[in-house]
């Protein structure tokens, strides 16, 4: 069964973007390819239990098992050695991607205190959008009473758009709340 957002994309957004951006083929219309959620846990070098808690929370909100990210280089300033676990990330595609994006736009972001919209300047020049979230408790799956420490995360939405303008138009039609 398809996600509500996926149905909206195929039936409504694709024809609108096709006309709006003057494409010659329907295959040129940009689409979301994947969403990458990254949680960096700096405390994981001293206490591995903090990494386990972050992995559990990331698994709850994404619906799939995250992979542990490891340090590429040793840094004495942070007491970090090459190969030490320092975070977790998960890559979402398909139905889980659309479900997560729907939840992010309609449930999680409106729960952020003093939320005025996500930044319009968070595009990378190649049609990808990255935003940071300061607290994981804005997601309904994360139980506030079981949270040991508030952690932020980076959410990257990778699109097939060639330019920032195309990616902005796509995300705006999907319902991403951009700041005015």
UniProtKB/Swiss-Prot annotation:
Q: Does the keyword Lyase apply?
A: no
Q: What SUPFAM superfamilies would the database entry show?
A: RL5-like
GO CC terms: ribonucleoprotein complex; ribosome
InterPro entries for this protein: Ribosomal_uL5, Ribosomal_uL5_bac-type, Ribosomal_uL5_C, Ribosomal_uL5_CS, Ribosomal_uL5_dom_sf, Ribosomal_uL5_N
Name the domain of life this protein comes from.
Bacteria
Alphabetically, which GO biological process terms does the record hold? translation
Q: How does it assemble?
A: Part of the 50S ribosomal subunit; part of the 5S rRNA/L5/L18/L25 subcomplex. Contacts the 5S rRNA and the P site tRNA. Forms a bridge to the 30S subunit in the 70S ribosome.
The entry's function note states: This is one of the proteins that bind and probably mediate the attachment of the 5S RNA into the large ribosomal subunit, where it forms part of the central protuberance. In the 70S ribosome it contacts protein S13 of the 30S subunit (bridge B1b), connecting the 2 subunits; this bridge is implicated in subunit movement. Contacts the P site tRNA; the 5S rRNA and some of its associated proteins might help stabilize positioning of ribosome-bound tRNAs.
Which protein, by its recorded name, is this?
Large ribosomal subunit protein uL5
Q: What is the lineage of its organism?
A: Bacteria, Bacillati, Mycoplasmatota, Mollicutes, Mycoplasmataceae
Q: Which gene encodes it?
A: rplE
């Amino acid at each position: 069964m398809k996600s509500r957002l996926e149905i909206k994309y195929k039936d409504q957004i694709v024809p609108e973007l096709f006309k709006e951006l003057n494409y010659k083929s329907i295959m040129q219309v940009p689409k979301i390819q994947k969403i990458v959620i990254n949680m960096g846990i700096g405390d994981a070098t001293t206490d591995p239990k903090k990494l386990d808690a972050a992995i559990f929370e990331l698994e709850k909100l994404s619906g799939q098992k995250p992979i542990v990210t490891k340090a590429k280089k040793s840094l004495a300033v942070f007491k970090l050695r090459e190969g030490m676990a320092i975070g977790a990330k998960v890559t979402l595609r398909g139905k889980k991607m659309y479900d997560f994006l729907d939840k992010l736009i309609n449930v999680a972001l409106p729960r952020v205190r003093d939320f005025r919209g996500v930044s319009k300047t968070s595009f990378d020049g190649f049609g990808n959008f990255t935003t940071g979230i300061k607290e994981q408790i804005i997601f309904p799956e994360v139980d506030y009473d079981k949270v040991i420490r508030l952690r932020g995360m980076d959410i990257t939405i990778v699109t097939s758009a060639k330019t920032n303008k195309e990616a902005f138009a796509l995300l705006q039609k999907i319902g991403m709340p951009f700041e005015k």
